From Swiss-Prot:
Mg(2+) 1 binds at residues 66, 71, 103. HAMAP family: Inorganic_PPase. This is Inorganic pyrophosphatase. GO terms for cellular component: cytoplasm. InterPro entries: Pyrophosphatase, Pyrophosphatase_sf. It comes from Pyrococcus horikoshii (strain ATCC 700860 / DSM 12428 / JCM 9974 / NBRC 100139 / OT-3). It comes from the Archaea. Homohexamer. Substrate binds at residues 30, 44, 56, 140. Pfam families: Pyrophosphatase (PF00719). GO terms for biological process: phosphate-containing compound metabolic process. It is found in: Cytoplasm. It catalyses: diphosphate + H2O = 2 phosphate + H(+). Mg(2+) 2 binds at residue 71.
């Protein structure tokens, strides 16, 4: 089984999607799902002394303008593990440019954590935490000599639109999955 190609994007897209976690919160290791084999590989260890502030992964059967599956960040109180599948509710969209490529990311919360039951949109997230995420992504590739431009945040509706677009981009690239 290849979770990138064989899992659905979610049980109720775009309201609830599957987040396939590659990197747990607190890690400096950047893991990436190999799109051909479905195995997890160590892409690199971050050059900076930063740690991922969220669980980080992809939405299965999506594709984005940066030439990779669509990224998703899940706010977790405790880190999960690589290859964990989380039912996640999109609440925002983080907009950034990575070395000239549009590299937007969905921000989501786990459906199965009652702590986040009232978090429906980006306005429900403390600004200090959004600033922490933005700071991480602005600086995490700095010692590699790569330029990141942070464009800011949008709400849940923007995230849902981009998810649907990323599903269509997957179909265009890989064909329809029956």
């Amino acid at each position: 089984m290849n979770p990138f190609h064989d899992l659905e994007p979610g049980p109720n897209v775009p309201e609830v999607v599957y987040a396939l976690i590659e990197i747990p919160k607190g890690s400096r290791n950047k893991y990436e799902l190999d799109k051909e084999t479905g195995l997890l590989k160590l892409d690199r260890v971050l050059y900076t002394p930063f740690h991922y502030p969220v669980d980080y992964g992809i939405i299965p059967r999506t594709w984005y303008e940066d030439g990779d599956p669509f990224d998703i960040m899940v706010i977790m109180r405790e880190p999960t593990y690589p290859l964990t599948i989380i039912e996640a509710r999109p609440i925002g969209l983080f907009k950034m440019i990575d070395s000239g490529d549009k590299d937007y990311k969905v921000l989501a919360v786990p459906v199965e954590d009652p702590y986040f039951k009232d978090w429906k949109d980006i306005s429900d997230v403390p600004k200090a935490f959004l600033d922490e995420i933005a700071h991480f992504f602005k600086r995490y590739k700095e010692l590699e000599g790569k330029e990141i431009i942070v464009e800011g945040w949008e709400g849940a509706e923007a995230a849902k639109r981009e998810i649907l677009r990323a599903i269509e981009m997957y179909k265009e690239k890989f064909g329809k999955k029956e």
